[in-house]
């Protein structure tokens, strides 16, 4: 047993922290409670053996969401001395890349990582709408409009055989790129449909073979490999 009167050296403290980080569950912080909830459901379908080892933190009482709020949350975790491995996982859009720029270039503990949802082939040639055009233009929307709903399955993005278009909104000067997003109503429809998709897959595993889990699997792979490299 450790003698409480014995001083702990910095080296010993670092060693213990490293052991806790390796053995304890991986904490995944997202931009909001909806992302955490949907990714937790996704994990139960694609990687059920990892449930309990990967924890998506639900901060539903958090007053604000988004990438800027996520950056503050990571800083709070670091200041509190959370020893678990902590992964900040953000959207793959212009706003998130801009908001997390400082965090990614700063000095974080070795047990912390910052990642975005990965680029997806589906999003490399995707219909978009400009502010003054009703005719879709196909563009690469990776890193510009890659919110979670874009990763939950092609069949959920389609309506009447057409992909829900990305609407370009604000221009982010620092990245010289526009921010894009699908309509909020469509986002809510996709979230509801995904929950039904998960229920169907859990009740009938064969059903999952006819569903598109490509984007979800790519995100989970990003999580699992986040600590392979600095």
In which residue ranges do the predicted regions lie?
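Acidic, divalent-metal-binding catalytic cores of TOPRIM
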Residues: 1-230
């Amino acid at each position: 047993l450790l003698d409480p009167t014995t001083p702990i050296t910095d080296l010993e403290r670092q060693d213990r922290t490293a052991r806790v980080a390796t053995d304890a569950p991986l904490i995944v912080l997202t931009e909001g409670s909806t992302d955490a909830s949907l990714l937790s459901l996704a994990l139960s379908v694609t990687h059920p053996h990892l449930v309990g080892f990967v924890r998506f933190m639900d901060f539903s009482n958090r007053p604000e969401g988004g990438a800027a709020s996520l950056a503050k949350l990571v800083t709070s975790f670091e200041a509190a001395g959370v020893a678990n491995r902590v992964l900040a996982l953000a959207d793959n859009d212009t706003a998130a890349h801009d908001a997390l720029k400082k965090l990614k270039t700063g000095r974080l503990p070795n047990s912390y990582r910052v990642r975005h949802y990965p680029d997806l082939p589906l999003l490399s040639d995707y219909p978009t709408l400009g502010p003054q055009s009703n005719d879709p233009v196909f563009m690469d929307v990776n890193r510009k409009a890659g919110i979670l709903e874009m990763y939950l399955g092609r069949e959920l993005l389609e309506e009447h055989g057409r992909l829900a278009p990305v609407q370009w909104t604000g221009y982010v000067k620092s990245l010289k790129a526009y921010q894009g997003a699908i309509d909020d109503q469509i986002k809510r429809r996709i979230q509801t449909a995904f929950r039904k998709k998960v229920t169907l897959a859990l009740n009938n595993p064969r059903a999952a073979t006819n569903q598109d889990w490509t984007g979800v699997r790519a995100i989970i792979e990003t999580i699992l490999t986040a600590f392979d490299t600095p």
